[in-house]
Curated annotation (Swiss-Prot):
The keyword Cytoplasm does not apply. Its EC number is 4.2.1.20. This is Tryptophan synthase beta chain 1. GO terms for cellular component: cytoplasm. GO terms for molecular function: tryptophan synthase activity. It comes from Methanosarcina acetivorans (strain ATCC 35395 / DSM 2834 / JCM 12185 / C2A).
């Protein structure tokens, strides 16, 4: 009975050939407990009402769908920005952090652990940990702490312990590894609050569901403002949580083009041990990373390549399995932009609209700039502005100074 049940459970997390659960046996009971707990949680009216309360009164939802008049004039198409930068904390990450923290409380957990790259997910986890009374620990690569010191301090200010990861490339990939090691040791009282649509089932599904509030709002707001759905929706993609959250409510609306923009870094080249980019969808290969089969950056021996991007939040060697499936099936179009193109878009939105975007979101804006000239986006485009750029000002200033 148990073997059959586990087998059926594993099949639930498949997206074509991607997804699944490639984890140590010791984690399987915890994953099944999480799957069962989530099924109960999402069908519990009181729990959903509590989530709605926190999304509205703590996170500040719904976020505006803003008509970018000056950007629209420049590119000759109606450009709307989904303002996830206005969510409490400055990014879309709080949508998922609130959902998972309330799920953890529902399941009787008392301790939260998380990984973070740019620090936005870590900050969101620190926020919910503080307001809901959890002991909270965030793992962050030492390289990312150096380029996102303000976010590391914000987490500590809210009572979270930030643990620097000194192994590997000292970035998001390594932070996930350390968080998983912690979880294996402390399964009974700990919930691992994964920040993206990555990892073993049921995490990609759970994170997607909690982030889908973005796409649901876009759908309603587009009808209110334009009387129809957008021709194109653009979102940046590292692990892919903001992209999947924006895209998922539109999957069946085939007339809407869905474009995931990856970090092209210094160009789509690889050295022996590292990629000079983070473009897993565009040129990655099938492999296993952090408990799921997906598209990853790897060498000829199957070893994970270190990724690179000016944006800490996109600096990841893989991508969520559902996004890999949607890209391969043709429903989502994968594109990339370079560091320099993203920095140009960062400056352009700041100057034209008075909105400073995160470097992650700047990748989506940079593709808007590239594609608008060809007319491929149509007359009505939505760009998900996944976060604000305050956290990136020091990075941008350092680059300008040549530091």
């Amino acid at each position: 009975m148990t073997e059959t049940k586990v087998s059926e459970f594993q099949l639930k997390g498949k997206y074509g050939k991607y997804g699944g659960q490639y984890v140590p046996e010791v984690l399987m009971p915890a994953l099944e407990e999480l799957d069962v707990g989530y099924e109960k949680y999402k069908n519990d009216p009181e729990s959903l009402a509590e989530l709605d309360h926190y999304l509205r009164d703590f996170a500040g939802r719904e976020t505006p769908l803003y008509f970018a008049r000056n950007l629209s004039k420049k590119y000759g198409t109606k450009v709307y920005l989904k303002r996830e930068d206005l969510v409490h904390g400055g990014a879309h990450k709080l949508n998922n952090a609130l959902g998972q923290a309330l799920l953890a409380k529902f399941m009787g957990k008392t301790r939260l652990i998380a990984e973070t790259g740019a620090g936005q997910h870590g900050t969101a986890t620190a926020m919910v940990g503080a307001t809901l009374g959890f002991e909270t620990i965030v793992y962050m690569g030492a390289k990312d702490i150096k380029r996102q010191q303000m976010n590391a301090y914000r987490m500590e200010l809210m009572g979270t312990e930030v643990r620097a990861v000194e192994t590997g490339s000292k970035t998001l990939k390594d932070a996930i590894n350390e968080a998983m090691r912690d979880w294996v040791t402390n399964i009974e009282n700990t919930h691992y609050l994964i920040g993206s649509v990555v990892g073993p089932h049921p995490y990609p599904m759970i994170v997607r569901d909690f982030q889908s509030v973005i796409g649901k709002e876009v759908k309603e707001q587009a009808m209110e403002k334009e009387g129809r759905l957008p021709d194109s929706i653009i979102a940046c993609a590292g692990g892919g949580s903001n992209a999947m959250g924006t895209f998922h409510p539109f999957i069946e609306d085939r007339e809407v083009k869905l474009i995931a923009v990856e970090a092209g870094g210094k160009g789509l080249k690889c050295t022996e041990k590292a990629a000079l980019h983070s473009a897993s969808l565009c040129i990655g290969e099938e492999g296993i990373l952090h408990g799921a089969r997906t598209k990853i950056l790897q060498d000829k021996n199957g070893q994970i390549l270190e990724s690179e991007s000016v944006s800490a939040g996109l600096d990841y060697s893989g991508v969520g399995p559902e996004l890999a499936y949607l890209s391969e099936s043709g429903r989502v179009t994968a594109r990339y932009v370079t560091d320099d193109e993203a920095l140009d878009a960062f400056n352009e939105l700041s100057r034209l609209e008075g909105i400073i975007p995160a470097l992650e979101s700047s990748h989506a804006l940079a593709y808007l700039k590239k594609a608008a000239e060809s007319g491929e986006l149509g007359e009505f485009v939505v760009v998900n502005l996944s976060g604000r750029g305050d956290k990136d000002l020091e990075t941008v200033l350092s680059l300008r100074r040549g530091v």
